[in-house]
Amino acid sequence: MFEAFRVNIPVSTGIIQWMLNSAWPSIYWQLYDYYGVPCAAYYGTKKACEPLQLIYNYKDSHIYLVNEGLYEGDVEVAVKVYDDASALLSEQSKTVKTSYRNNVDAFDMTAYAGKPHFIALEVKCKDGKVIADNFYCIAAERNVYDWDNFDWYITPIKKHSDLRFAFAQPEAEVAMETSYADGVYTVTLKNDSDVVSYMNILKAKDAEGNMIVPAYWSDNFFPLLPGQTKTVTCKADVAGAKIELDK
């Protein structure tokens, strides 16, 4: 919803977030749970709200560069498209000019409509440093809504999009290296396989195997493309933590 709001500025004029936290352990939709642990939604929201970001618009299957920050000038934008078997279908990059709240139509993805695929996006500044990235699993068909039973707080869904292909990839071989200094764990993951490692979840645990709370990850619940290396950090006031990877 954050991305839908941003990609439609200035037609969209506001947004309300429901909900921030989980009052009970069993509730969902929250950004962090009953115990203060961020959920996947937290990291997705964080990425959606990057000041400068590439966003896929589900309405027209185009990718837009949005800017609600102070940076103005040229940036390099790049897109990679993979099919549902992790084969690279397309790779494009270009230089575009960006300015505050001036959305730029960067890429046309309509050629892939009707087929399940992955989309990986990057924004780079002049020195080649990646300043934003984004990732999508696009189903062959969109959700089908039951508009006849629309109410002010909910629109029921007749048929959900089929995203099972994202979890049907062969298990990827992901190598992990960790280091610790001054209260910060640095974790580097490398996907040594030729398939998309869709959901990589990092956890910091104590000697008894309990999750360390709070633990502040720079990113989590993220994909790794074939051959990709990614480094993240975790601030936790516990030395000797065991870093675990679920995928």
What are the functions of these language-model segments?
Residues 241-247:
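A compact, surface-exposed functional segment
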